[in-house]
C-alpha cells in the first residue's frame, strides 16, 4: 500500500507538468508544433524560441504580440552585456541557453558573432578615422603655427629633387633644417615682441653674413656654413612673423600655403628647366631663393592676401565673427612714436588713435607685391627660355641685390630702434643720403663708377629711406594718402636696393 501511494505521489507532478504543457501548447500553436519544446526555464529561452522558430503557415503568429516586448528586453540586456565584455561567452552563460535546441543555439551564436564582428570593425574604423583626424589636425596646426617649416621643407625637396645639385646641398639642407627648427623653437619660447624685433634684425644680418662668405673660395666647409646661415635666417624670420601676426589658424594655414606655392614654383621651375650651372651660380641661386622671404619681410604677400577685404569677408562669414583675428592686430611698434616713453606695446595698442584704420587698401598692396616681384619674375622668364649665359650673369647680380636689400632692411629697422628719440636727425640724414644716393644711381646707370663704395652708400641710402617710409606709414596722425607715400618710399628703396645698378651689369 505504501509503495502504491508512493508511485501515485510521484506520478502527480508528471501529470501536472504534462497538463501545463498541453495548456501552453493550446495557447501557443508554435510551441505545439515544435517537437523539441522543453519546459520554460528563463526569458532568454522564450526569446530565442520566438525569434528563431518559423511561423506555421495558416496559423496565427504568436510572435506578433510579444516580439516587440522581447526585442526591447533583449536590446537592453544585450547592450548591457556587450558594454561589459563584448563577447559570446556571456551569451553561452545565459540561463537556459544550453536547454535550447542545437539549431537555435548555432544560429544565435552566429548572429551574435556577426554582430560583434561588425561592431568591432566599425569601432576599429572609427578609431582609425579619429586617430587620423587627430594626427592630421596636429600636423596642420603645427605647420600653421610654425609655417616657416613649410618653406624650409620646400627648399629641401627642391634641392633633393634635382640630380644636378651637389651633395653638400642635400646634406646641408637636412642639417640646417634641424638647426633652424631648434633656433625657431627657442625664439618661440621667448617674448613675442622681442622675437619680432630679433627676427626682423637677425634674419637680414645673417643673410648678409652668408653673402660675405660667398666671397671666400668655395670649399666643403664654407658651403655648409653658407647653407646653414641662409636657412637659419629664413627660419628666424618666419618664426617672428608668425608669432607677431596673432591670426586665426585658417589665416596662418593660408599664409603658409601661399609661401609653399611660391617657393615650390621657383624651385620646381629651376629643376624642370634643368640648367647646368656652375657651382658658384648654384650657390648664388640657393641664396637668391632663400632671400625672397627676407627681402619682402615688411610686405609679406600672404599677409597682403589675407588683409584684403574680400578674404576677410569670407573668413568672417565662415566663422560668424566680425573680426578675422584672434585679437586686434598690432601695428608696427616704433618706440620713437610714443608720447609716453614708459608705455609698453600693449598699452600703446590701446591708444584711442589706433581706432583709425591703419591697413592699406588691397589694391595698393597688390601693386607693391607686383613691384617687389619684378626682379624675381625676370629670373623666372630667363629660366623658362633657357638662356644659360644670361642666367650665369643675372643670378649673381640679383643675389647681390637681395643681400643688399636685406642689409638695408636690417639697418633701417636698427635705425628706427636707435634713433627713436631723435626723429629730426633721422629725417635730416635721409635728406643728405638722398642726394648722395641719387648721385650714386646716376653714376651706376652711366657706368662711370661701380665700386664697393657705391654698394655701401646705396645700402645706407636704402636703409634711411626704409626707416623714413616706415615712420610715415606708421604715424596715426597722418592721413591715409600720406601713409601711402611712406609705403611708396619703402617700396622704392627695396626696388633700388634689389635691382639698382645690378641690372646695368648684365651682358647680353
UniProtKB/Swiss-Prot annotation:
Keywords: Host membrane, Membrane, Transmembrane, Transmembrane helix
Gene Ontology terms: cellular component: host cell membrane; membrane
Topology in the lipid bilayer: Multi-pass membrane protein
Spans traversing the lipid bilayer: 133-153, 168-188, 197-217, 218-238, 253-273, 286-306, 365-385, 398-418, 425-445, 446-466, 486-506
Subcellular location: Host membrane
Chief location of this protein within or outside the cell: host cell
Keyword check for Translocase: no
Top-level taxon: Viruses
Entry's family note: Belongs to the alphaherpesvirinae HHV-1 UL43 family.
Name of the molecule in the record: Membrane protein UL43
Organism expressing this protein natively: Psittacid herpesvirus 1 (isolate Amazon parrot/-/97-0001/1997)
Underlying gene: UL43
Amino acid at each position: 500500500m505504501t509503495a502504491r501511494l508512493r508511485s501515485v505521489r510521484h506520478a502527480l507532478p508528471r501529470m501536472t507538468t504534462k497538463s501545463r504543457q498541453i495548456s501552453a501548447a493550446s495557447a501557443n500553436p508554435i510551441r505545439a508544433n515544435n517537437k523539441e519544446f522543453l519546459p520554460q526555464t528563463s526569458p532568454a529561452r522564450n526569446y530565442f524560441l520566438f525569434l528563431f522558430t518559423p511561423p506555421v503557415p495558416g496559423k496565427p503568429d504568436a510572435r506578433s504580440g510579444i516580439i516587440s516586448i522581447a526585442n526591447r528586453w533583449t536590446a537592453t540586456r544585450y547592450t548591457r552585456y556587450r558594454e561589459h565584455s563584448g563577447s559570446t561567452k556571456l551569451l553561452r552563460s545565459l540561463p537556459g541557453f544550453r536547454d535550447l535546441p542545437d539549431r537555435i543555439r548555432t544560429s544565435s551564436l552566429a548572429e551574435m558573432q556577426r554582430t560583434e564582428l561588425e561592431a568591432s570593425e566599425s569601432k576599429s574604423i572609427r578609431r582609425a578615422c579619429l586617430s587620423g583626424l587627430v594626427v592630421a589636425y596636429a600636423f596642420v596646426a603645427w605647420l600653421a603655427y610654425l609655417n616657416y617649416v613649410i618653406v624650409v621643407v620646400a627648399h629641401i625637396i627642391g634641392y633633393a629633387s634635382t640630380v644636378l645639385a651637389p651633395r653638400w646641398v642635400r646634406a646641408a639642407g637636412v642639417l640646417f633644417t634641424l638647426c633652424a627648427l631648434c633656433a625657431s623653437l627657442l625664439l618661440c619660447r621667448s617674448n613675442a615682441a622681442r622675437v619680432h624685433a630679433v627676427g626682423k634684425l637677425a634674419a637680414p644680418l645673417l643673410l648678409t653674413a652668408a653673402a660675405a662668405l660667398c666671397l671666400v673660395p668655395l670649399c666643403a666647409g664654407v658651403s655648409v656654413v653658407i647653407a646653414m646661415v641662409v636657412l637659419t635666417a629664413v627660419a628666424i624670420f618666419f618664426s617672428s612673423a608668425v608669432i607677431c601676426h596673432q591670426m586665426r589658424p585658417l589665416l596662418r594655414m593660408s599664409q603658409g600655403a601661399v609661401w609653399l606655392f611660391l617657393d615650390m614654383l621657383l624651385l620646381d621651375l629651376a629643376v624642370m628647366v634643368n640648367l647646368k650651372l656652375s657651382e658658384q651660380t648654384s650657390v648664388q641661386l640657393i641664396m637668391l631663393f632663400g632671400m625672397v622671404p627676407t627681402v619682402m619681410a615688411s610686405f609679406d604677400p600672404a599677409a597682403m592676401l589675407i588683409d584684403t577685404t574680400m578674404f576677410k569677408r569670407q573668413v568672417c562669414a565662415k566663422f560668424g565673427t566680425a573680426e578675422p583675428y584672434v585679437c586686434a592686430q598690432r601695428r608696427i611698434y616704433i618706440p620713437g612714436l610714443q608720447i609716453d616713453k614708459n608705455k609698453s606695446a600693449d598699452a600703446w595698442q590701446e591708444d584711442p588713435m589706433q581706432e583709425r584704420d591703419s591697413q592699406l587698401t588691397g589694391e595698393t598692396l597688390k601693386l607693391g607685391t607686383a613691384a617687389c616681384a619684378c626682379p624675381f619674375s625676370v629670373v623666372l622668364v630667363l629660366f623658362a627660355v633657357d638662356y644659360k649665359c644670361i642666367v650665369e650673369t643675372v643670378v649673381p647680380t640679383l643675389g647681390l641685390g637681395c643681400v643688399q636689400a636685406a642689409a638695408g632692411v636690417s639697418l633701417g629697422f636698427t635705425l628706427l630702434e636707435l634713433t627713436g628719440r631723435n626723429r629730426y636727425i633721422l629725417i635730416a640724414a635721409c635728406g643728405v643720403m638722398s642726394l648722395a644716393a641719387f648721385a650714386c644711381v646716376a653714376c651706376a646707370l652711366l657706368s662711370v663708377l661701380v665700386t664697393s663704395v657705391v654698394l655701401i652708400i646705396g645700402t645706407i641710402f636704402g636703409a634711411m629711406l626704409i626707416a623714413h617710409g616706415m615712420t610715415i606709414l606708421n604715424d596715426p596722425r597722418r592721413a591715409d594718402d600720406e601713409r601711402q607715400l611712406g609705403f611708396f618710399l619703402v617700396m622704392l628703396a627695396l626696388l633700388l636696393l634689389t635691382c639698382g645698378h645690378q641690372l646695368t651689369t648684365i651682358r647680353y
